[in-house]
């Protein structure tokens, strides 16, 4: 992957390593896998869900006698379900913390994921945002300091009348953890805004709110054709804060990420 990578197009140093957390808690930790298992269960991160579904379908074609059940509910649920022995594999789109590792899970990296800041294409200053982007300090002010800001102010215009509506994730998830870390070594609980559960609902909220801003995972903002989903725009991050989006900062399609 080139450039940077985080909330938005910011293909910078924030790369979220998605993981399948192999569950091994309790007495099962050192036990050999059952060869006669007929159902394999996975739960967790929305970021990994689309990939896990495809893998499950491919696995079932090779092993038709085995059923693969995949459910999404956020990285926190994936880790908790795995530790509790409720599923065979927990999908976690962040690094597991020490407390989770101490409970006997085995983390297996499977891919890199990215988190992107998004707005509606109906945003009143969408063209200016595309040219100027947003800075980390602006996002910090919105999400951590709860600063009241208009979109016109964001792009340097006076007399703004369109307040920024801030959306964040209400479920424990890797996207929020990654975004918070990028803003300044924060945690998900430090982020403020209107709570929305899951990537699909988050994107839908922004698409239906021209003044909204949020963040979402790579798997949900880009379609199969590599384009940004219809109705949304990725907010590129002005990393060097020079007042414009340089070529290496711009993300307009999946290939840029």
Model-derived features: where do they sit?
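Core hydrophobic alpha-helical transmembrane segments of single-pass membrane proteins
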Residues: 10-17
């Amino acid at each position: 992957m080139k450039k940077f990578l985080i909330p938005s197009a910011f293909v910078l140093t924030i790369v979220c390593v998605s993981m399948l957390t192999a569950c091994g808690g309790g007495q099962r930790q050192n036990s050999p896998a059952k060869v006669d298992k007929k159902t394999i269960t996975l739960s967790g991160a929305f970021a990994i869900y689309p990939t896990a579904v495809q893998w499950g379908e491919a696995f079932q074609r090779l092993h038709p006698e085995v059923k693969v059940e995949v459910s999404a509910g956020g990285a926190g649920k994936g880790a908790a379900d795995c530790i509790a022995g409720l599923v065979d594999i927990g999908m976690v789109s962040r690094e597991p913390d020490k407390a989770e590792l101490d409970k006997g899970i085995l983390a297996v990296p499977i891919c890199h994921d990215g988190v992107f800041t998004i707005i509606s294409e109906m945003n009143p200053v969408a063209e200016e945002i595309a040219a100027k982007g947003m800075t980390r300090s602006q996002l910090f002010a919105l999400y951590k300091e709860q600063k009241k800001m208009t979109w016109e102010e964001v792009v340097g215009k006076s007399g703004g009348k369109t307040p920024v509506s801030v959306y964040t994730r209400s479920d424990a998830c890797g996207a929020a953890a990654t975004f918070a870390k990028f803003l300044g070594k924060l945690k998900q609980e430090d982020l403020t805004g209107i709570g929305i559960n899951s990537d699909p609902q988050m994107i839908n909220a922004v698409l239906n709110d021209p003044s909204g801003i949020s963040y979402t995972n790579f798997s949900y903002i880009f379609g199969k054709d590599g384009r940004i989903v219809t109705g949304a725009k990725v907010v590129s991050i002005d990393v060097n804060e020079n007042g414009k989006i340089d070529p290496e900062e711009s993300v307009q399609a999946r290939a840029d990420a």
